[in-house]
Amino acid sequence: MIYKLYFAIALCFSLCFDLCIAESYVLDDKVGLGRTFDGIGGLSGGGATSRLLVNYAEPYRSQILDYLFKPNFGASLHILKVEIGGDAQTTDGTEPSHMHYENDENFFRGYEWWLMREAKKRNPNITLIGLPWAFPGWVGHGKNWPYDFPDITASYVVSWILGAKHYHDLNIDYVGIWNERNFDSKYIKLLRYTLDKSGLERVRIIASDNLWQPITYSLCVDQELADAVDVIGAHYPGTTTVIEALKTQKKLWSSEDYSTFNDEVGGGCWARILNQNYVNGLMTATISWNLVASYYEDLPFGRDGLMTAEEPWTGNYVVESPIWITAHTTQFSQPGWTYLQTVGHLVHGGSYVALTDSNGNLTVVIETMTHDHSVCIRPPLLPFNVTAQNVTFQLKGSFALIKELQVWQSRFDFKTKKPFFFKKLSPLKISDGSFTLSLDVDEVYTLTTISTGLKGTYPDPPTSGPFPKVYFDDFNVANPSFSEAPDFADQTGVFEYYINLTDPGPHVFTLRQVVTQMPVTWATDADQTISVIGDYKWQNLTVTCDVFMETVKTGGVFIAARVDKGGQSVRSAKGVFFWVFADGSYKVTNDLVGKTVLAEGLSGTRAYGWHTLTLTVEGQYATGLLNGYPLWKDAVVLGPKNGWAAIGTHSFELAQFDNFAVEAKL
């Protein structure tokens, strides 16, 4: 018994000793500096991740943009990376190309131009990056490969960069190759040549937006390729790099990272990798996929953004924890600052980085995220331990004379569920060139000489609510601000506002599917085009739309309800699809591909004439009207039980839609 008492006392003393004794860390620029900091950013696209953002009414849309881009307000991002739209499915939808066809150029399609302008308006120094996920079909000459004609691909990409400047006064700083797909050395060299020939010497190339290898090996053995590439960009590197990448002396970036549900564990993931991407892997930029979760949440990777803005119909948005975790770094350091060599891991878990502008300013960011509270979506996270600890930082070199540091703290507090983020504490007085902190687990601290930090706020946005049960759009917009109609989320193909000059009647302004050739794809696009809309929970509803086929004999269009899949799974989407064809037939199918037929027959429909389709789904039965008259009824629908409404075409073909309406009971 006495032995046990002595043991207990000794154990308590040991624990107290471990906690009370502060480990010491030196922050010193005399020993030399580390790598130049290039910034923290967000990625819009790859794909259609900002689709719903553009539909927000003011002031809410501007408030969201302020939280993302406005300096000293929210995330204060240094980098905006966007998809160079390629008319193909690239995760959560398609983004339109500026060149659907070889003789076509339109630099006002989509919303990435607008987003870059808004970012630049708030932060003129923001770095802009463009990267293709897919390419229009003509670039590949009918093959699902962009490198057989590298001169065409290079000219296509460069035209996007030139258009950004000519039409929007946007200087693109970096361009990538082909997101997470094979690179081609010949193409990269030709891209560099084409950029230079076009007066774009300042535009730098990132390669290859995939894994560290094989691009690193290729750079080591091909000097001409090495001369063309400025940044090695890796995706989801797990905070580590490879020796060969370090040997190249190139900038190393985590050019896509995070991709994690933006709850507090997601915030913890972001906190850990923002520090440890440099501590472990010497990566000087980290870019979040995605910038803002502004797409239907039931599409793939719902809420995997720095914040959430998925309800333009209510105006509701949520400033999630990753916004404030970002601010711990972005509000107190800028691209061009330099990491100290004295960065690293804390003895009892966690990490610290320090940056300087070489003009006397110092910013230190500390994170103590535990394993289970910082798991990212990928790669797998090996076990590690973090415990409460005291730490002492000794300021050396040019920092020895610092007398005061501003302090900002975030505490996740998974135990009591009372977290707080980006809280300004009292300034820390420095005594004898050192200071001591008591760190708990799952915290983030910033200590800095910069005094301009601010936790920006706006009045609470409107409360959350479902998509309207009664919805109508006649597309009568003479001068639309964007090329796409609100709330429609294209999943294969591109649906654009169209002025139908051949129809002086009620269908002058329509929505038109415009992609006529399978693109060079990134995901597995459907063979049919489809755009979804509404509430994924919808079960019993009526969908009505006027349709106009533009392909004789083989043309076909549909309206649909209960569509259960989008994104990279769109080919396998099920639902209730009501098709009419230009050969005078109709079909009702339980799937997009059209294999499971629920009803079929003659419709008398032809191309180049308007027809009104009405689909009602109630319980296990579906009924269809053509031009207001019953065409088929009581088709048995065993599943799915719920899903979006949709419109689309039988193939990559031109077709128009007008007066789209939904009336849902649930």
From Swiss-Prot:
Glycosylated residues, chain numbering: 125, 361, 385, 390, 500, 540
InterPro entries linked to this entry: Aldolase_TIM (IPR013785), GH59_C (IPR049162), GH59_cat (IPR049161), Glyco_hydro_59 (IPR001286), Glyco_hydro_59_dom (IPR035394), Glycoside_hydrolase_SF (IPR017853)
EC number, UniProt record: 3.2.1.46
Localization annotation: Lysosome
Binding site for substrate: 91, 133, 179, 378
Reaction(s) the record says it catalyses: a beta-D-galactosyl-(1<->1')-N-acylsphing-4-enine + H2O = an N-acylsphing-4-enine + D-galactose; beta-D-galactosyl-(1<->1)-sphing-4-enine + H2O = sphing-4-enine + D-galactose; a D-galactosylceramide + H2O = an N-acyl-sphingoid base + D-galactose
Signal peptide location: 1-22
Annotated keywords: Disulfide bond, Glycoprotein, Glycosidase, Hydrolase, Lipid degradation, Lipid metabolism, Lysosome, Signal, Sphingolipid metabolism
GO cellular component terms listed in the entry, alphabetical order: lysosome; membrane
Function: Hydrolyzes the galactose ester bonds of glycolipids such as galactosylceramide and galactosylsphingosine.
UniProt protein name: Galactocerebrosidase
Phylogenetic classification of the source organism: Eukaryota, Metazoa, Chordata, Craniata, Vertebrata
